């Protein structure tokens, strides 16, 4: 179910825009639908037909998603979320009141270093199911930032994701720059985002400056050369007034050489953006491994000292074997599941 469908149902119960907005706000804050205002109880505010429908509506909303299991970790608690049809997605409670949500069950891009991509795309996550992940998190703690970096490629579920972003940036009371749309790069994204009422921050999965290598690592991503992707990102960054996050998963011996670093400096120097280097969350038996800690430090120092802002981001859930897609793979017993190895707890990396 999409939120637009739910909104029409509220209208059918006699709810005016002010009533529908109130219902959306209290739900997105994790509160009961009959929560009143400071001055009035809901029985003096909501239409009678809507009040009588609230128990059934509450049951329906609660049935959208539930926490199947919670896995606490030093870098954030990962929630395995069961949807109404039994499919599962993952959400991560991040430090500083952040939340990472999933936008698809599985993913069609098939990134070679991502567990989610191994299962392929199973189905889209609706806007209501995306919002339900936020509701579940807010019933546990405050959520002031939502990043669309969980399972799935948001660009492949654009209507549902944009609808969720619009609700979170209005009725959900989250600042627009604290809503982060993450994508491998799709021209539809650069066409759609500038036209939205709520214009989110943008994270672009760059990973390499070499077009051929990027095509191998992200086999079903749109064919956009890295330099063109950066130019598209720069145009959007200048339009909205906050920087692009360029994502770079560090793979030992693949994209961590000085030739790559020099090339990324040429691409990003002077651009309104930040390079997020993400040491790979190692999987036993996988083709890829993360660079050692000293090499990661060298990379950060090298890039930072030459004028490009760089930050180290570690994939949340490493100490609970919970990198993106891993909990779902274990829970569903997917054929593609490999034996997981806990990566060493990341140490602080000094620039």
Swiss-Prot record:
GO terms under cellular component: cytoplasm
E.C. numbers: 2.1.1.-
Residues involved in [4Fe-4S] cluster binding: 107, 111, 114
Gene Ontology MF terms in the entry: 4 iron, 4 sulfur cluster binding; metal ion binding; RNA methyltransferase activity
Domain Radical SAM core residue range list: 93-319
Disulfide bonds: 100-324
Any GO BP: rRNA base methylation
Record key words, sorted: 4Fe-4S, Cytoplasm, Disulfide bond, Iron, Iron-sulfur, Metal-binding, Methyltransferase, S-adenosyl-L-methionine, Transferase
Subcellular location: Cytoplasm
Active-site residue list: 90, 324
Cofactor, how bound (note): Binds 1 [4Fe-4S] cluster. The cluster is coordinated with 3 cysteines and an exchangeable S-adenosyl-L-methionine.
Pfam families noted in UniProt: Radical_SAM
Essential cofactor(s): [4Fe-4S] cluster
Keyword Zinc: no
Record keyword Signal present: no
Lineage top rank: taxon: Bacteria
Residues involved in S-adenosyl-L-methionine binding: 152-153, 182, 205-207, 281
Family: Belongs to the radical SAM superfamily. RlmN family.
Protein name (database record): Probable RNA methyltransferase BAV1540
Protein species of origin: Bordetella avium (strain 197N)
